[in-house]
Amino acid sequence: MASILVGSILGTVKDQLVQSFSAHSPRGRRGWRWAIWITLVSVLVLLVVSEVVIRRAGPILKGRVIETLSSRFDSKVELDDLQVSILRGLQVSGKGLRIFPPDDVVAAGAKNPLIAVQDFNFHAGLIGLFLKPMHVGVVHVQGLAINIPPRQMRGQGAKKSRHEGKIKILVDEIVCNDSRLVIDTANPDKDPKIFELEHIVLHDVGPNAPWPYDAKLTNAVPKGEIHAAGTFGPWNTESPGDSTVTGHYTFDHADLNPIKGIGGILSSVGDFKGQLDRIEVQGTAEVPKFTLDTANYPMPLYTKFSAVVDGTSGDTYLQPVEAKLGQSQFTCSGAVVNVKGQGHTVDLDIDVPAGRIQDFLQLAVKTEPVVMTGVLEMKTKLHIPPGKQSVSQKLGMKGNFTLKQIHFTNPELEDKVDMLSLRAQGKPKEAKPGAEDVHSRMTGRFQMGEGKLDLQDLNYAMPGATVRLAGVYTLDGKKFDFTGKVRTEAKLSQMVASRWKSWALKVADPFFHKNGAGAEIPVKVTGTNGSPKFGLDIGRRDSKQ
């Protein structure tokens, strides 16, 4: 191409000079003859130099790129192709750039390149080719992949003194599209931690200083856009996972609905710092209309959290999270654990010091209105295993609770509880529908899973009586099935208003008067939330007799 260009230019120059030469006198022609030859020789020299520059620029720059990167990362560097053009300054494009881990890390088993680039290009002034170091304004990168080997591999080789070679190229800014950061793990039960970076810009890229960056990525689950800005580096050559990273992030409009069993739009902001292997995060998150599919009742959920992301395992440790559901505040701590090929397991310890039971029932139980209101104290362990099932079906909880100031929203059930309290105190004449609500307290152990709530050692105390129950309550509100005993202060004969019924029951008093109680009566609660049935469980008592 250069030869054709040289021939064309020389031919054109010659034709123009010959025309001018023919128009002058013989004496003038001798002067023009010399001018023609001097011009032709000058043009020829210029074009020969240009052709040499074009031919040599590629190898020169390829050598500089490899030498600069090899010096910076202290490792082997490969570059498949480098193309150079000088028609509009110095334009460079390359393909297949690979930077490998240090030799001792490769010997320990690291096989993938530490850094791989599909394509890159940059533009610089032509004079820069002859300067050392060469200055480049912006480098555009497509398909950047960074693979951080497991910490165990990075620790195999002894640390050695680095030879700081001369940097042959200085870059102001690197613009990367479609990048991926992979932090590998040596644990066979874990998947590597992967960050997909849609767009990232690195500023002031120097060898021994942090690089300011601005990044944008689309989170897969829940799907939403994350924007982060901060600093990265300096790059730790011996152990890349220990390279420092800091920043501030925003996570907007993350749709929870594709996650089976839950719904809502998540937003989060926060700050992070640490190393690639271990990043500390502090932030807030909110879902104004959070739902579980067992109820589909939207509840506002807000959290303030502190977490550690372990890049070596892919696990996230929460320590702790301050949360608010509706008007109920609680804390939780625990871990989101990476399970190879399956997803994550969530294990949390939850502490509700003084919440509202109605907030939790509205979220989880498909009944309107909720069964009861009251003040909830609860300590529980929450477990969500990986899998494709609905979160509500996978969700498991186990713990204990205390309920105070209980009020049943079903008027019929509340009346029965209030009248039971009055009869148990020996005030049967006051036991009428619409009686004043009694102050009651409930404690117990529970286990929730597979869409049902299993209650054990349920102790319901009210003036004049204590109710001890155990049984199952389905979260869809379609089934109550509890059995137990009511222990009262009054005897059976003292619980009825009719005098003749009272005399008749005196015969039965000795059979129910036991263990220090006026009466101990077997009871059952069955039915549904809309139609509960509260009555004696005489058959069960008879079978035990």
Task: Describe each region flagged by the PLM.
Residues 47-150:
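Terminal hydrophobic membrane-targeting helix
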Residues 212-215, 251-255, 289-290, 315-322, ...:
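Transmembrane beta-strand segments that form the barrel wall of outer-membrane beta-barrel proteins
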